[in-house]
UniProtKB/Swiss-Prot annotation:
Tissue distribution: Brain.
Taxonomic superkingdom: Eukaryota
Name this protein carries in UniProt: Tachykinin-related peptide 7
UniProt keyword Glycoprotein, yes or no: no
Localization annotation: Secreted
Principal localisation: secreted
UniProt keywords, alphabetically: Amidation, Neuropeptide, Secreted
GO cellular component, one term: extracellular region
Residue numbers of Arginine amide PTMs: 10
GO biological process per UniProt: neuropeptide signaling pathway
């Protein structure tokens, strides 16, 4: 999973 998706979900 890309960091963009991870932080976007947070």
């Amino acid at each position: 999973v890309p960091a963009s998706g991870f932080f976007g979900m947070r």
